[in-house]
Each structure stands twice: as C-alpha cells, then as structure tokens.
Design a protein with these regions (language model features):
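Short acidic, glycine/serine/threonine-rich loops at helix termini
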Residues: 50, 108-111, 164-168, 376
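Positively charged, Gly/Ser-enriched RNA/tRNA-binding surfaces
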Residues: 2, 14-33, 37, 43-44, ...
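Acidic, His- and aromatic-enriched active-site or binding-groove loops in soluble protein domains
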Residues: 57-67, 169-199, 331-332
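Intrinsically disordered, low-complexity, charge-biased terminal/linker regions in eukaryotic proteins
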Residues: 147-148, 161-164
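Short, conserved phosphate-binding/catalytic loop or strand-edge motifs used
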Residues: 114-119, 155-162
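Polyanion/phosphate-binding surface patch
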Residues: 40-71, 106, 111
C-alpha cells in the first residue's frame, strides 16, 4: 500500500513496472487510432495567463528569459496541444502524449510537483458527434484501468452553467459566476453578494462604501500602474461593480435551486430522471439535460451505470477549464489523487480558436507515477 507522503516527493515507483505500463498504454492508444504528439516543456507564459489569470504563478513555475520573455514550465498538456492543433489545417484529430508536467503543490499533497503523465486529446468540428466522443474517451480510460480496482465518478459542468444562464440576472453577473465556478469559496461569496436572500439594500450600500468608494479616491493618487489593466480599465470596472450591486439580484428561489443542484449526487443511472424533474425549465437547462440523458444512455450500453457515481459539481476544484462532461477514476483508498481525470473543454477551444475554426474537444490524463510498483496491490 502507498503510504501518505508529505511535501513534493515522488511516490516510489518501480521503474520496470512503470515502463511496462507506459508501453501497454501506448499500444492501446495506437490501436485506437491515436497519433502521438509532442509539445515543448518550456512555454510562453502569456499563452497561459489569459487562461489561468495571475493564479498561474501560484500553480506553475515561471521564469524570465531576456529574449523570449516570461516562460513557464509546462503545467499540463491540454493547452499547448490545443494551440499546436490550431496552427494546423486539420479540424479533426486524435492525439496521445506522454511526458513530465510541473506544478506547485501544497506541503500536504502526495502529488509530486514533477509528475509523469500520459493522456489524449480528441478534436472534432461536428457538433452532433460530441456525445459519442465523450463516451469514447471515458471507455478508453476505463479499458486502460480495467485491471485495477478503481471506481469512477462523473459530472457535468454544462448542467450547472446552463442553470446559471437561466437566472434572471444580468449577463455580467452570469459571466462572473461562471468564471469562478472552479474557485468554490469565491463562487459562494459572489452568490451571496448577488442574492436577495443575503444582500439587503443596506448591505449593498455598506459594501459600496467600504470597498468601492475608497478605491475611487485612491485611484486618483496612483501615478503609475503595473499589469495589463490601465487606470481607465480599473475605473470602468469599479463603476460596473457599483451598478451591478444595486440592481437585478438573484431571487431566493433561484439561489436555493442552484445550491440544491450543486449538492446533487446519485448513481449515474438514476441521475437523469432525478435532475430532469427539477423546477428549472429554461431552454438552456433543458438542452443540457437532454445531452446528459443521451450520454448516459450511450454509456449504459457499455458499462454498468448503477455503480458509476455522479456529482453535478465533480471536478470543479481541479478541472479548471472543462465545461461539459467530466470524469475521474479513483483507487479505493481515498488518500490518493484521482489516477485519471478528463472532460470536455469546448469553451476553451472557442476562446483560443481563430475565425473559421470552430472545434470542440475532450481529453484525459493518467498519473503514471501512481501506476508502478506502488499500486500493484490494487490489481484484481
């Protein structure tokens, strides 16, 4: 059994077993028709800052180059592979990759700061093919891990974002809530702030007087600014916040529905029926549920969905840019991180794509450092 490790040390992986696993998985990928792709270990930081924001510096290792500017050690494969794919002519592709990624970890984490990953990315330009590719991605990981005693958990970010889209609030508030879905504490603070249940007129005035007005005064005193935003940008942002806090707040019933939805969990087989009976009946939410039902139906033809878990908010703290179907595989011992995770990231494709290139994508990664000698006890 793998003992809990602190700090950034690697799990003690048997190199021979790990080598066999890598060869085995590579063979599975090749038989499935995937093409190997390589991307640099050192990336241009600006390409990732637009995605992660300044939080990137808290998660990744950055350095400054006198010629190339700010650089970052590869924190994952998805974004650099997507950028590489977008430079090509083909819209459809199925890639697999292997190599190291580097991420800062907390002292208590058992995930090494340098870890070896394998995985894949599917790109497609046919909108009606997304659900089939979701299922294909899940089954590919399921096949790889079939010899291990691992259980899977699934989620669907689209259900939550579509529910937010149906709220009777401004587009600014909707975008703000969706942007912070992956940061639960920030999201809940925003939800409380935008909610009529927790934010009275007095509290709004108090919030404005204690956090916004002083900044207006201080803004006049600043002579120089660091960062991307200009003085005008900051001033406009303060004015927008003032306006948003004074009108169109979230109704109690909508807030309660959203909170209930975020707590929902069941077996995958029971989830469609339970969620479809919800009171939110807007078009966006209905479409998300229809897609969910189709995906579960297709998955049920290949796996026992009664033993697959479903949580609406699964992966929100770790799968930053996923916006649809998400999944993970976990060993029975909950002290370990998910051995594999993946999901759909169409919005990321849309934001990084050039005009005329409308593509969707789903991908998954495997933590190979946990598939060596230290996990042999988990095999059947």
């Amino acid at each position: 059994m793998l003992k809990s490790q602190k700090g950034i040390g690697k799990p003690k992986t048997d190199s021979s077993n790990l080598g066999l696993e890598i060869s085995h998985i590579r063979l599975i990928f090749e038989k499935a028709g995937l093409k190997e792709i390589s991307v640099p270990s050192l990336l241009t930081a600006s390409d990732l800052v637009d995605l992660y924001g300044e939080d990137l510096k808290l998660r990744a290792y950055t350095t400054s180059d006198p010629v190339k500017g700010e650089q970052v050690l590869r924190p994952d494969f998805t974004v650099p592979i997507l950028l590489t794919h977008l430079k090509g002519k083909s819209l459809q592709a199925k890639y697999f990759y292997s190599g190291n990624v580097w991420r800062r970890q907390s002292f208590e984490s058992i995930i090494p700061n340098e870890q070896y990953q394998m995985g894949f990315e599917f790109f497609d330009n046919k909108k009606n093919n997304s659900i089939a590719l979701d299922v294909e991605a899940y089954l590919l990981i399921s096949t790889i891990l079939s010899k291990y005693r691992a259980h899977s958990v699934t989620g669907d970010v689209q259900i939550l974002t579509s529910a937010i889209n149906e709220l009777d609030i401004s587009e600014y508030k909707k975008a703000s809530l969706k942007r912070h879905l992956w940061r639960p504490k920030r999201f809940m603070r925003l939800l409380d702030l935008y909610s009529r249940q927790t934010t009275s007129g007095r509290n709004i005035r108090l919030h404005k007087s204690t956090t916004l007005l002083p900044w207006k005064k201080k803004l006049r005193e600043f002579k120089s600014f660091e960062g991307v935003r200009t003085k005008t940008d900051i001033k406009e942002r303060i004015e927008i916040l003032e306006q948003e806090l004074s009108q169109g707040l979230i109704a109690n019933s909508e807030r309660n529905f959203l909170l209930k939805l975020m707590k929902f969990q069941s077996s995958l087989s029971e989830a469609p029926k339970s969620i479809s009976s919800a009171s939110m009946v807007g078009g966006s939410f209905k479409k998300a549920i229809e897609n969910f039902e189709l995906r579960v139906g297709l998955l049920s033809e290949h796996v026992n969905t009664k033993i697959v878990k479903f949580q609406v908010i699964y992966g929100l703290t770790t799968l930053e840019y996923y916006d649809g179907f998400v999944f993970g595989f976990q060993f029975d011992n909950r002290n370990y991180p998910p051995i594999a995770q993946g999901g759909r990231y169409d919005s990321l494709c849309s934001s990084l794509s050039k005009k005329g290139k409308s593509i969707s994508a789903i991908g998954s990664m495997l933590r190979m450092d946990f598939l060596g000698k230290t996990v042999t006890d988990y095999r059947d």
